[in-house]
Regions:
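Regulatory and interdomain segments flanking nucleotide-handling catalytic cores
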Residues: 1-389
Length: 389
């Protein structure tokens, strides 16, 4: 039986807290594979001011696979400095070639090492599993929710030097030309509308699945109680969305689409982006319509299709809030940590950054959001240090 449409046919959850109910999850077909990508030594890259590049390359690994599978719906989660993607078996050879092309571009254009691995489900099944649900974020975006420990295990296999070679695509000299169509990085960093942007990662360590579900539900409810439900803590609000025109803000996208083409081509692409953004600014300001689409609605569409809360064996959230709210939350999390029930990490910034995958202006799109200057990557580093303590 062909399993290609497994994910497309899943029922859609409407409430984030429903991810804590195991009955809402379905096992991924055993003939599928997990793609894991991440930037090696991402902390060093962040220290040298390259976190926007780190974010962009994580998104690149997603967009090339989405373009490869076309209209087929597949699950993916953006992790800040990398991504987790699940694909049917027939796409694996082409996925290897596309990811190697991204890896080459990351090395030669950005001087960053994109680590990539493709792990068959059968390599995970003897130790863990991957169960999946689908959550509606907006009319234009449904988000994959992954649990079962399999994603974390696959990540370990790809990162561990003793097993990495088993799952890394083999280098060759016939790189495909990766298709980055739909990738955009055209917004200014987004200032918090409160006092700070909190990038948070929480991993529950309770002994049973029921206890794990209950504690994740408690954590989510606690965050809602402290920060408010709905849009109150949303890091991307329309009034703070501003298109970028400065070179440094547009350079990352320019280096992707004009890779290996020399400085003149990069300069031309940069000015092309400025012109596109100028037109976008005019269209949005004056509510200009193209066909049935009103550009005055676009910022709201962007805000609604952001992935600011998600789950892939760990809870990840980017939250806009006040310092006293963070202290209240971290006091709660620290208490649970001292009880041996969870580990957590966080990073604080004054703004968020966003990388976009846009297939239709008034349709299918997702906007990956992270805290600036380290975000999820530094939150993960802090969590790892806490696990060692």
């Amino acid at each position: 039986m062909n399993s290609d449409k497994f994910y497309a046919n899943l029922p859609v959850l409407e409430n984030f807290v429903d991810i804590t109910n195991g009955e809402n999850f379905y096992p991924v077909p055993q003939d599928w594979a997990v793609i894991i990508t991440d930037i090696a030594d991402s902390t060093k890259a962040i220290e040298t001011g390259k976190y926007k590049d780190v974010n962009l390359l994580g998104a690149c690994s997603i967009i090339v696979i989405l373009n490869l599978v076309g209209e087929l719906e597949i699950p993916f989660v953006f992790g800040g400095d990398g991504a987790s993607i699940l694909i049917p078996p027939k796409f694996i050879p082409d996925a290897e070639r596309a990811l190697l092309a991204v890896q080459k571009m990351a090395s030669e254009e950005f001087n960053l090492n994109l680590r990539i691995g493709i792990v068959p489900l059968e390599a995970i099944a003897s130790n863990y599993d991957i169960r999946i649900a689908k959550l509606r974020i907006s009319d234009n975006y449904t988000q994959a929710i992954l649990r079962g420990g399999g994603i974390s295990y696959a990540t370990t296999l790809v990162k561990d030097k003793s097993t990495n070679s088993l799952y890394s695509p083999k280098l060759n000299h016939q790189y495909a030309i990766a298709d980055f169509s739909g990738l955009e990085c055209r917004w200014q960093d987004i200032p918090t509308r409160h006092e700070e942007i909190l990038s948070l990662i929480v991993q529950v360590t309770a002994p049973s699945q029921t206890q794990i579900d209950n504690l994740y539900r408690e954590v989510i409810n606690q965050i809602d109680h402290i920060y408010g439900k709905g849009t109150e803590c949303h890091p991307v609000v329309t009034e703070n969305l501003q298109l970028a025109f400065q070179r440094k803000s547009l350079l990352s996208e320019t280096r992707v689409f004009a890779a290996f083409q020399g400085r003149i081509k990069q300069t031309l692409y940069l000015w092309k982006l400025r012109l596109i953004n100028l037109l976008g600014l005019v269209f949005m300001t004056f509510n200009i319509k193209t066909g049935s689409f009103n550009w005055g609605d676009y910022k709201q569409i962007v805000s609604e299709a952001t992935d600011f809360k998600k789950f892939d064996d760990v809870l990840r959230m980017v939250i806009s809030g006040k310092t006293k709210q963070r202290h209240k939350l971290t006091d709660y999390l620290e208490k649970k940590f001292q009880e041996g029930r969870l580990v957590y990490g966080f990073h604080v910034s004054d703004r968020a950054l966003m990388t976009c995958l846009v297939f239709e202006r008034d349709g299918r799109q997702v906007h990956f959001v992270d805290g600036a200057d380290g975000g999820y990557a530094l939150a993960a580093k802090q969590m790892k240090e806490l696990m060692k303590s």
